[in-house]
Amino acid sequence: MSMQVVGKGLFVCYSVFKKCSSVILSLIVLLSLSACNAEDAVYREYRCYFLFDTQLHPMPCQLTGIIGNPGHFCHVEASLEKGIRHIKSTRNYDGAVEDVPLTTDRENQQSCILGANNCIIIGTSSYDNVLIAYEGQCANCLEQYGGTRYPLSWQNNGTLLHCNKCDRTYDVNNGTVVSEGGGRQLYRYQAAFDGQFIRAWN
């Protein structure tokens, strides 16, 4: 084999490697940017940490019922009664309220912090079948007035959330304002389901 052929082969290999390296580098940059954007969208003004074990609380538990059911959401609040933590959920489509006592040692020892005023909204979007969690107070009122008590109520069979303070209405499936006047969308927390635990955090 002549040196000329070997040289051409090496040149071709180098060219392919250079192109592949450029593509891989571009992908890494894009993934990094999208990860940063996702992180930037997470509300961090008030701490959120919620963990719910669906194996300990199987169906017909309302919170467990949001998994895999597009359009199903719950208001979630926490309280401590006689040393036992309770999770109160209010379902969007019928307003049903459920009180779930967390009676195991593990559940009672873990933190439960629910945003600005002890309330988050969590469920599965009917637009993209993704689990999402929102701050339970009106984002525009939190931003405009300060304080922490601007609760949202279900409307239109649970597809909308309404704030009585500013009269804004939000689409529960993506958090955007759908009433006149516009405004910022609902604040979001990270949310995930790993097959056992429903999580929301920031």
Predicted regions and their residues:
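N-terminal pre-ligand scaffold of iron-sulfur
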Residues: D40-S153, Q190-N202
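Short Fe-S-cluster ligation motifs
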Residues: N164-N202
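Residue-level signal for mature regions of secreted extracellular proteins and peptides
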Residues: V29, L131, N156-T159
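Sequence contexts marking disulfide-bonded cysteines in secreted/extracellular proteins
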Residues: N37, A139, N164-D167
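Cys/His-rich short segments
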Residues: Y145, N157-G158, H162
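C-terminal motif of bacterial Sec signal peptides marking the signal peptidase cleavage site
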Residues: S32-A35
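Bacterial N-terminal signal peptides that target proteins for export
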Residues: M3-I24
